[in-house]
Structures are given as structure tokens and as C-alpha cells.
Amino acid sequence: MSRHPNARRFLILFILGLIGILSFLLVDLSALVALFPVPPGTQIPQITPFVKLLAVLQPAVLLALAVFGGVMLAQRVGLSSPFAEALVTREPAWPRLRNQLLPGVVGGAIGGAAILAFGAISKSMLTADVIQRLHEFGKLLPLPTRLLYGGLTEELLLRWGLMTFLVWVIWRLFQRRQTKPTTVTFVVAILLSSLVFAIGHLPIAFMLVGERTFSIIFFVVLANSAFGLVAGYLYWKYGLESAIIAHMLVHVVLVVASNAGAYF
């Protein structure tokens, strides 16, 4: 085993998350900004290389903090990244990943179905203009970006980083007499991290729609929270990679559904 296992854990997970962040450079930011409704005469800022650098730098800093926090706390609270752990200990990684495939696929199917259901309900409450903008927004996100940023980076931020931290904080504040976090601790942490995951999608939704409507809040919060619950459960019971697999599969489901006209 490496003399510095935590450093290896950090590097492995940070590099994976950074790949997801860099995949965001595949997005046409100028076309994306042009989708936002603005008052007539408003000058749309030019997307310069500096702006693109900031678009990468800010999430990279957050990623570093999340990965570091997870590395320091995950094992203490009984959470893990089995695939990354196998790489650290130089053991065969495939068996660790194989055990997470089925839970990840099932979770992705459930999460995708939930988002499609909430999308169908919300669609009846949205104007044709908003639906068109949501559709165009989806078309501007390449599949590699959806898979790598959504699947890798967001799971490292929200599950490995935030959820792990919440489990540890709740445990240390309210259950100090317990030798390990209880089921209630994990459930509360999953709920809170799912809500944060959902709320984190609201700003871009508001910018895209141009107003804060009940239908948008309903769809964004409930759809993303539903998947957050699935991903949180998978991380708790099977490991981080199962949540990553589920997240990636959800994006595949949504792309297929969108191309078939069954989603935005």
C-alpha cells in the first residue's frame, strides 16, 4: 500500500472530477448565454478565454474541497468509493466496480423514470416558449458533458463531499455516544444533500426561463430531489460508483426521451 493513501485517494478522485469539469468546455457558452431571455437592448457579454477559465476554475476549487472532505471523513462514517480504494491499495478494481453495476443501473432507471414523470406533469404548466428554451438548452449540452460533469463531478461534490460531511456533522453533534452513525443520520443527510442538489439547479433554470414560476420550481426541486434520494441511498449502501453509474444512466435516459419527444 502507498505510504500516503489519502494523497492517492485525493488525486484519483480529483482527477476524475476534473475530467468532468473540463468536459464543460465542450459546451458552446455563447449559444448558451444567447438562450437567456434579456430585456431589449441589453448587451450580451462576449465569452472570452478568461470567462471560460473562470467557468473551469470555480468548480475546480469546490471539487478540491469536496474531495478533500470526503477523503478525510468517508471512512470514519462508513462511506466509501470501492473503485478508488482498489486503485489506492493496488487491488483488482473491476470486482469492486462490478458489484456496483446492477444497483447503479436499477437506480438510474428509477431516477430517470421519476424525472420523466415530474417532467410530464410540469410540461402541462409551462408555456410553449419555455418548453422550447428548455429543449434548446438540452441540445447544447453534449452527451460527454452530461455523463462526465453530471455523473462524475456532481456526485463527487454532492455525495462524496456534501453528504459525507453532513453525516459526520450530524453524528458528532447529536449522536456522540454512538460508535458510528445510525440509520437516521444517513437518512437525514441524504434528504439534506438531495435538497441542496435540487436547489443548486434553480439559478440556471431561473435564468433560462426568465422568471421564478411555481411550475419551474416544482419540476426542478422535485425531479432533482427524487434522483438525489436514489443517489444518496446508492452511495450509502453500495458505494460512490453506484451513484455515479446511476447518474450517468439518468442522462442517457433523458437524452433518449428528449430525442423521442417525450422530454424537454
Model-assigned labels for residue ranges:
Residues L16-L35, V67-Q75, I115-A120:
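Alpha-helical transmembrane segments of multi-pass membrane proteins
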Residues G41-Q58, F137-L147:
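Membrane-interface segments at the starts/ends of alpha-helical transmembrane spans
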